[in-house]
């Protein structure tokens, strides 16, 4: 059959006027650069604690960082989302004795998961059913964790380890606070990460460190209430939301 005849048959089976164009998701950025020193309107929704001016990193204290940790949790929990972190099974590739993965989930700034082995380190997150994840929040601190702080984080998602696909790589250049990763480029209709399994891979640390620290991570699904965009989070912060400022003034 000639090409014209083939096209007629195909048009009869699926009329071209009924076929809607589909936007490809392959053009979505595969790397997300994180640096809360750089004030950028395009990334403001990422930083739950807000942007930090570079001068405010000179004299931070553990109390300042601890305040940011708990402040971020309060802001996240007020954002009309449901925290499903503890509905998952969390399985690390390794952990140092005394620093289990539970310490990344206990809402305590002073405790953390620490890997114990060769890179890349890995953290698998498994739910009993498919979840509609709208936000993955991770606490990073270059100051507190130094060479234990990850500089790259690869995110994979799927229904199981066997079909998990790469979603995005986070390049953590300089962050001290909570980062809220939303999935705006994943599904055009609902902007959710629909999955039962998530894998986080930590291939590289800052300062060529070997083991990784993770002080806090949370997963959220939408609630039945109207969704609150993350740009509203900044409105819940105190007028001087840069908590390092107090340390400098002292």
From Swiss-Prot:
Organism superkingdom: Eukaryota
PROSITE patterns per record: DOC (PS51284)
Pathway membership: Protein modification; protein ubiquitination
Cellular location(s): Cytoplasm; Nucleus
Record key words, sorted: Cell cycle, Cell division, Cytoplasm, Mitosis, Nucleus, Ubl conjugation pathway
Disulphide bonds in the chain: none
Domain DOC: 60-246
GO BP: anaphase-promoting complex-dependent catabolic process; cell division; chromatin organization; protein K11-linked ubiquitination; protein ubiquitination; regulation of meiotic cell cycle; regulation of mitotic cell cycle
Listed GO CC annotations: anaphase-promoting complex; mitochondrion
InterPro entries (alphabetical): APC10/Doc1, APC_su10/DOC_dom, Galactose-bd-like_sf
Molecular functions per Gene Ontology: enzyme regulator activity
Membrane-crossing segments per the record: none
Note: Present with 1364 molecules/cell in log phase SD medium.
Protein task: Component of the anaphase promoting complex/cyclosome (APC/C), a cell cycle-regulated E3 ubiquitin-protein ligase complex that controls progression through mitosis and the G1 phase of the cell cycle. The APC/C is thought to confer substrate specificity and, in the presence of ubiquitin-conjugating E2 enzymes, it catalyzes the formation of protein-ubiquitin conjugates that are subsequently degraded by the 26S proteasome.
PANTHER family: ANAPHASE-PROMOTING COMPLEX 10, ANAPHASE-PROMOTING COMPLEX SUBUNIT 10
Family: Belongs to the APC10 family.
Oligomeric form and interacting partners: The APC/C is composed of at least 13 subunits that stay tightly associated throughout the cell cycle: APC1, APC2, APC4, APC5, APC9, APC11, CDC16, CDC23, CDC26, CDC27, DOC1, MND2 and SWM1.
Name of this chain's protein: Anaphase-promoting complex subunit DOC1
Naturally occurring in which organism (per UniProt): Saccharomyces cerevisiae (strain ATCC 204508 / S288c)
